Amino acid sequence: MTQTEFKHRIRISKTDLEGKNPLEYALQDMKGIGRAMARAVIRVTELDPKQQAGYLADEDVLKIESVLEDPATHGIPSWMFNRKKDVYSGLDKHLIETDLVLTVQEDITNMKKIRCYKGIRHELRLPCRGQRTRGSFRKGTSMGVKRKK
């Protein structure tokens, strides 16, 4: 592996990443990629996780993008994906960046539309996962206590 010139910002899958960070940590700056997925991508592409991301060659960037595009064909197990059994296609997918954000928004909108419990809680801007609400999640202005004159 030859050292190419250092780039302070590298662009992978429509995302700018810091070139000074090690590759493992630079990949984790992308929305939808955590520690386990970053390590899996690096293992599949056979790159050095400690290498600064700014020294990546263009071929290596293309390799990383192809793995992120379709991780299943590169041997990454489906239990690592962030969207198992997609509602519309039935496939296991791993979404990143804007695809992930838009899909989550679409799921919440669908829950609101079918009026399920989680959808109603989202509409009311209350927690969906069973937290207690007596002391927390209070929004808006309160009247307070009026003082006698």
From Swiss-Prot:
Task: Determine if Zinc is one of this entry's keywords.
Answer: no
What keywords sit in the KW lines?
Ribonucleoprotein, Ribosomal protein, RNA-binding, rRNA-binding
Q: Which Pfam families match?
A: Ribosomal_S13 (PF00416)
Q: Per the UniProt entry, what are the Gene Ontology biological process annotations, in alphabetical order?
A: translation
User: Which is a Gene Ontology cellular component entry for this protein?
Assistant: small ribosomal subunit
**A Gene Ontology molecular function term of the record:** structural constituent of ribosome
Q: Which PANTHER family match?
A: 30S RIBOSOMAL PROTEIN S13/40S RIBOSOMAL PROTEIN S18, SMALL RIBOSOMAL SUBUNIT PROTEIN US13
- Assembly mode: Part of the 30S ribosomal subunit. Forms a loose heterodimer with protein S19. Forms two bridges to the 50S subunit in the 70S ribosome.
Protein family: Belongs to the universal ribosomal protein uS13 family.
Q: What does this protein do?
A: Located at the top of the head of the 30S subunit, it contacts several helices of the 16S rRNA. In the 70S ribosome it contacts the 23S rRNA (bridge B1a) and protein L5 of the 50S subunit (bridge B1b), connecting the 2 subunits; these bridges are implicated in subunit movement.
* The protein's name in its UniProt record: Small ribosomal subunit protein uS13
Provide the taxonomic classification.
Archaea, Methanobacteriati, Methanobacteriota, Methanomada group, Methanococci
The coding gene here is rps13
